[in-house]
Amino acid sequence: MYSLPSQAMRPLSLSPCLTRSSYLRFRILSSLSLPPIFHNSQTRLSFSKNYTRPHLFIRNCTSITAKPSSEFNRNRTQDAPDEKLRALRELFSRPGVNIDAYIIPSQDAHQSEFIAECYMRRAYISGFTGSAGTAVVTKDKAALWTDGRYFLQAEKQLSSSWILMRSGNHGVPTTFEWLNDVLAPGGRVGIDPFLFSSDAAEELKEAIAKKNHELVYLYDLNLVDVIWKESRPKPPNKPIRVHALKYAGLDVASKLSSLRSDLVDAGSSAIVISMLDEIAWLLNLRGSDVPHSPVMYAYLIVEMDRAKLFVDDSKVTPDVMDHLKNAGVELRPYNSILSEIKSLAAQGAQLWLDPSSVNAAIMNTYEIAIEKYLTSNNNKKSKTKMHTDTTGQSGGPAGVFRTSPIAFSKAVKNSAELEGMLNSHLRDAAALAQFWVWLEEEIHNGAKLTEVDVADKLLEFRSKQSGFLDTSFDTISGSGANGAIIHYKPEPGKCSVVDSKKLFLLDSGAQYVDGTTDITRTVHFGEPTAREKECFTRVLQGHIALDQAIFPQSTPGFVLDAFARSSLWKIGLDYRHGTGHGVGAALNVHEGPQSISFRYGNMTPLVEGMIVSNEPGYYEDHAFGIRIENLLYVKEVGTPNRFGGVSYLGFEKLTFVPIQTKLVDLSLLSAAEIDWLNNYHSQVWEKVSKSR
């Protein structure tokens, strides 16, 4: 247990609740803990005589869909962006290519959000390093699409050779619409089919066919890799490790047995799994191939009587080999996945393939091979005919094409996973307590700290915690206007000094052996303006509203999104990112299928045991950014009534880090909201002061 100085353990007066006329205050009492004690000055707003005006700490939260992946190192090549485009276009006329346009997405062959540096092709060709975006290059134009989280970043990073397409803005065409507009009818659009999900490739194919364009799969030739040449980073080759059962909660045999029951119910003989976190979760393995995500590059095929892991065997340690052998899992070379798909199809295997995650290369290989099998068996009646199954998703005699059952199972945490998440969050909170006190003292003493200095120091505090492995994404450390860049990543020599006269947004997270954290706080080390306080308070009100939400079972996340935005909406403000994303247990900091977002297409219900972030925000371009983010887990709550006989759900907090009250405009808060803030800080003090 951490040893707290005696003065740190001595509480200030704590009123049972604060009235609207009370002055909310929080005092940092030790470099180890942030006791959330508020002083009730009764009817006056002045400080008591012996009380020093407190500095309060918060951090801000990031968007739900994606935090920045490990950013691409732009110093790896001296090629000018124009030269890269010229070299790429020269390949368009190469024999066997013959295309008019080429699309470069952000993903790797597994549709990962965070990817290894050697697969950051879109970043290499465009110079834009955000985690989400699509580059399209024609013979005379180059355009990049990204969403609202990255508009400002893309403006800074793209050269004049590129057109920035702000996805979602009025009048901005989609990639399909743009291609149909700029290409002459009958054009050929090339893609690497490993980098597109089957669904995405089919959508693209159908859209461009309206102008008689052809989608060309370039299986054996990624054009960006050709021009990247020797400067391209080597593929990762770090060892895999076994994820201990005390953290996993379920052994591999139990997980495989449950999955095979799903195969029987679906009428499938085997399932092909390509999502890296699904493979890691199912096999109780963790890796280090992808920055910030404890996963390894692999494919997995689970049949009724065996399973095959396609992975570079140089990563497999003796412990991992024994672990897999005991679970009945065989090893295969990573690059032999297409050969195995062909072999299974030649035997008439009805494979379960998730079109939203399995890449187009695998899907197309299976469809061609199974068609050949059906033809050779004179089964022409079922050769190409598809049907709709009872879930409303496509399937047929040739295979089962529906969402992977692993995603949902992984999202619903068991008791061991929840315990690990709780414990890791408390250790993380202790590190943040030390960090915030250090930062306050440094700023107070006049230190000139850059945004990178701050991020590095936070990493230093976290790395001292037991079980720490890595950050869970690149720390977003933004002072002033940089805080408005939702996925800002400071760079040495280019970043700003943390300014005590401006808002400072810090969004960070960590990977521990037993859990994954993600927290954002926004703070001010000087005197915030009335505008900053109002915006911050309204973001806080949205955060509180979502935290306190109670809803019937089977409610999808989009239903709750308005809880977090309502206070901002009242004065005509909003934010361009989702409100909440799923979080893995010692896995990816972003995971599905659940989310809390204005995108109402995701009908995944929130279920007891799921973890989501609660991170509303507000951003004024070139001025400041505000986010407040905690992680929550879903649990059943008791209600006096159960309309329709259904259970009702709510949230419990995983994150316990103070929220800076200096930024709160008390006149906007209700008594209930003040109570929430007081109670939360009481919990922070109670839990974190005792944590290890």
Where would I find each of the regions flagged by the language model?
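Active-site neighborhoods and metal-handling regions in enzymes and metal-associated proteins
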Residues: 2-692
